[in-house]
């Protein structure tokens, strides 16, 4: 369960502070997905960073399964983040010198050497995203869609309660984007996680259970956008 209450964030400027988020509220149960759309500079990435505990709000709260991660010290919060939150970035953030399997196992390294269970789960996820035949390949040997599949598998390795995706199909052609969207939603549903996606793609947004637009720093619920391509 992800519960966001009255979240606000501003940044200092030469003049008045720049208010980016104003009283944001959001509640998602396990298995639910939400898209957040809005123009560049509207605060989408800031919101995602706060949900991922990579930035702190000025006021308001974030709770994941009843736990406030901002009540933890920096070390505890980092450990909590690694166990509870999965990230999918637009540019993948795959380490070029590591194989597909090694990249998927990166979250397990925070606990030391990956366990046999970690390795088994990585293999299962790599198979689930259709890359068993690429398990030993390096990122440079993969297509954009294949790299996105690796990122999805890595995000799910630790069985997180929440997955945060920043433009997961932003660099893909429409056909590949559709395939990746279907894969992501299938695995998210199977694992019963919360999925929050920041996107400019209205067709991707339409695939989510909930759709929100950031307007003047506040989240406004929207219906389907009706975009099919």
UniProtKB/Swiss-Prot annotation:
One cellular component term from this protein's GO annotations in UniProt = plasma membrane
The record, for CDD domains, names:
ABC_MJ0796_LolCDE_FtsE
In the record, the note on similarity to other proteins reads: Belongs to the ABC transporter superfamily. Lipoprotein translocase (TC 3.A.1.125) family.
- Tell me the first and last residues of the signal peptide: none
Instruction: Write out the function statement from the record.
Output: Part of the ABC transporter complex LolCDE involved in the translocation of mature outer membrane-directed lipoproteins, from the inner membrane to the periplasmic chaperone, LolA. Responsible for the formation of the LolA-lipoprotein complex in an ATP-dependent manner.
Q: What class of enzyme is it?
A: translocase
Keyword RNA-binding, does the record have it?
no
What is the native source organism of this protein? Rhodopirellula baltica (strain DSM 10527 / NCIMB 13988 / SH1)
Q: Which InterPro entries match?
A: AAA+_ATPase (IPR003593), ABC_transporter-like_ATP-bd (IPR003439), ABC_transpr_LolD-like (IPR015854), MacB-like_ATP-bd (IPR017911), P-loop_NTPase (IPR027417)
Residues reported in the UniProt entry to bind ATP: 38-45
Q: What is its EC number?
A: 7.6.2.-
Q: Write out the annotated subcellular location.
A: Cell inner membrane
Instruction: Look up the domain of life of the source.
Output: Bacteria
One GO biological process term: transmembrane transport
Key words, A-Z: ATP-binding, Cell inner membrane, Cell membrane, Membrane, Nucleotide-binding, Translocase, Transport
Classification via PANTHER family: IMPORT ATP-BINDING PROTEIN, LIPOPROTEIN-RELEASING SYSTEM ATP-BINDING PROTEIN LOLD
SUPFAM superfamilies xrefs: P-loop containing nucleoside triphosphate hydrolases (SSF52540)
Molecular function terms from GO: ATP binding; ATP hydrolysis activity; transmembrane transporter activity
Matching entries from SMART domains are given as: AAA (SM00382)
Q: Write down what this protein is called.
A: Lipoprotein-releasing system ATP-binding protein LolD 1
- Membrane disposition: Peripheral membrane protein
Main location class: membrane
**Domain spans labelled ABC transporter:** 2-229
What is the annotated quaternary arrangement, including any partners? The complex is composed of two ATP-binding proteins (LolD) and two transmembrane proteins (LolC and LolE).
């Amino acid at each position: 369960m992800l519960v966001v209450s009255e979240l606000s964030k501003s940044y200092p400027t030469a003049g008045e502070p720049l208010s980016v988020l104003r009283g944001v509220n959001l509640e998602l149960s396990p298995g639910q997905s939400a898209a957040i759309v809005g123009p560049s500079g509207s605060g989408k990435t800031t919101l995602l960073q706060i949900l991922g505990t990579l930035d702190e709000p000025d006021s308001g709260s974030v709770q994941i399964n009843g736990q406030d991660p901002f009540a933890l010290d920096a070390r505890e919060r980092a450990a909590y983040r690694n166990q509870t939150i999965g990230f999918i970035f637009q540019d993948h953030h795959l380490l070029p010198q590591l194989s597909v399997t090694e990249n998927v196992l990166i979250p397990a390294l925070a606990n030391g050497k990956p366990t046999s269970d970690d390795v088994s789960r990585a293999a299962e996820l790599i198979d689930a995203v259709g890359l068993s035949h690429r398990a030993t390949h390096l990122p440079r040997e993969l297509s954009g869609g294949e790299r996105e599949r690796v990122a999805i598998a890595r995000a799910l390795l630790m069985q997180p309660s929440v997955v945060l995706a920043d433009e997961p199909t932003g660099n893909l052609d429409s056909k590949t984007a559709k395939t990746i969207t279907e894969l992501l939603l299938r695995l998210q549903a199977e694992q019963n996680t919360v999925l929050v996606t920041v996107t400019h793609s209205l067709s991707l947004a339409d695939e989510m259970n909930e759709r929100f637009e950031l307007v003047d720093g506040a989240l406004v619920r929207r219906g389907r956008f009706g975009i099919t391509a």
